[in-house]
Amino acid sequence: MKVRDVIKALEADGWHFARMRGSHRQYKHDSKPGLVTIAGHPSKDLHPETLQSIWKQAQLGGKP
C-alpha cells in the first residue's frame, strides 16, 4: 500500500495533519490519544510491518 493511500484512510477516519519533518508526517485525532507517524514519500510503498504499526497507532484494527 502506498503512503498516499494510508494518508487518505487516516483522514477519512478523522485524523488531521499535525506536523512534518523531512519525510515524516504526524497526524493527530481530536478524540483518539497520541500521534500517528507516517514515514516516506507519497508515491512509495510501505513495508507490511510498518503498515501494521500505523494501523495499530491509529486504532483502526486491520487493513482498509
Regions found by a protein language model. Give the residues of each.
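C-terminal structural segments of small proteins and small subunits
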Residues: 4, 8, 13, 32-64
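Short beta-strand
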Residues: 17-20
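Active-site beta-strand termini and strand-to-loop segments that position acidic
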Residues: 27-31
